Amino acid sequence: MAVTRRKVLVGALVGSGLTLGFLLRPRSYPLPLEPREGEFAFDAWLRIGTDGVVTVAVPQVEMGQGVTTLIPQIVAYELGADWRQVAVEPAPVSARYANLPLAAKWAPMWMPLAPSLADDTDGVLTRRWAEGHRFNATADGTSLAAYEAPARAAAASARAMLMQAAAARWDVVWEECEAHG
């Protein structure tokens, strides 16, 4: 079999297409928090019980940095919940809790040939690697940078859903409702 320029180009195009298809293939991960009896799960971050207790999943290990207070306070504030009704539990290992800022900082260890490709914390390579390896490491003070936005978004969406449910029950416009305690 002779190697021709056409065969080399076809091989390069096929290989590039397969690589690009693999990198851009959408991935979904199961919800790591299973609601218990009388609870409802909102994304990977919180469960709300019918008794009003809000349980927040914390994917970092508490080593004196206050992460088991910080993330639940963010959720409670965004949700409009009473702080006395907030419980904390360790999050299970899951791709949903991938620590992207730390994965980008540690890129020279997991991608030694081209670490500069992982400089952007929202980069495709960093996200694919961190989620694919369920990278949930606690280090380098990245708890707030890694988890504030997704925890806040989960709490905000839960607050909006609860306000919509209350508005439907009270027959008012949900934008007029406020969440307190």
Annotate each language-model stretch with its function.
Residues A2-G181:
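Cofactor-binding beta-sheet edge motifs in enzyme active sites
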